[in-house]
Amino acid sequence: VTKRNVVLITYDSLRADHCGHWGYERETTPNIDAMAEEGVVFESATAPASRTNPSMAGTLTGEPMVARDRVANPEHARNHLERHGTLAERFSAEGYATGAFCPNAYASKYYGFDRGFDRFEDFMFDNSRYQDLFEEHLGDSGFYTLLRNLRNFVFRQEAFKTWDSYIDEMVEWARDQREPFFLWAFSLDTHFPHLTPRKYREWSNLFDQYYYNWRCNQLIDEFDIDISEEEIQNIIDIYDDSIRFGDVLIAELRDRLAEFDPVIVVHGDHGEAFDERGLYGHFYPSLYEENLHVPLVVDDGETSGTVDKPVSLVDLPEIVLRAANIENGTPEEISHDWVVATDYDGRNDRRLTAIRSRRFKYLVEAADNDERRELYDLDADGREIENLVGAHEASEPLEALVDRRITHEEELLSIRSATEELGAD
């Protein structure tokens, strides 16, 4: 069986319910929708966490990342990726050329995401001496963030780097490789700030982009935002335009790499909140559907279908390896009765755990000695408003599952701590 070339496209902050194939009324994702018509759609795909760093660490290893520290500490992701091994390392072991183009700082070399890649371009400081100097003296300061953002704006790097500024590099890299190859393309276009070129703007204008990105910047670290429905809709407008622009990346890669007949896999790394419960974006961890439910579509030119049972993005390595003819089986055979999501809010010492079945979601949020438990019927209450804990027969079995998961995480952290102490001795 011939090993297939693979292109993995990750969209930052892309909600499933803002994609056309999931029923969205706007034509935001014509290329993802075309893939969905031809390939395999996972309708209940769930991110393992609500922010890029823990979500992608879990996605690329096949194991949720468990940590009790701020995301800014790179050691947790580095250790997790090393401990569990990455999809790129697996491809490399199978004789693949591996390349990544990822302008997201939280999935960069600094956090260890270059493991297994022959080439990893994160568009950060090219000179490591300057990188080390900045981090050593300014790394925890607001001044460092300001300088980095100014540099990013001038050179179109990190948060300001759109896919059209590096697609030539991706295509050139793929053409230079001996087949087979694995290419990971990360698009920040769907992440705040939403800077969509004029020709792709359908629902916003230039003023909207500047003003409502400024408003987003005001709201992003607020826990209980004060904003009108009209402003939220305007923010959604610039978000949807950015999705429409980001979606074009698929068409470009399919067209320019057509001779290699690659398997194409598209997914969001997590979602985005729009004041469903007082939050904007994903600055604060949240395990509700707006932050966890993501698109996941596989087009291998051979299999098609819809999977409505839950999958987690931690299933992505197995899905991709099957589509590439490395593992036995087909992608659509992968599903579960339930999946888990976990995250940690280091600012407020909030521990979040969720169990999601096809119909129900059970959430636990704990901080200090305070704990809140919630159960939602996603079929009847997709916006997760009516808490059914204790009032529905699904409460007891899902409570047992989530408690087992919480116990597992605490045991894992205890073992890890004890191991580190032994190593220190």
Q: What are the residue ranges of the model-derived segments?
A:
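Catalytic domains that recognize anionic headgroups
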Residues: 1-425
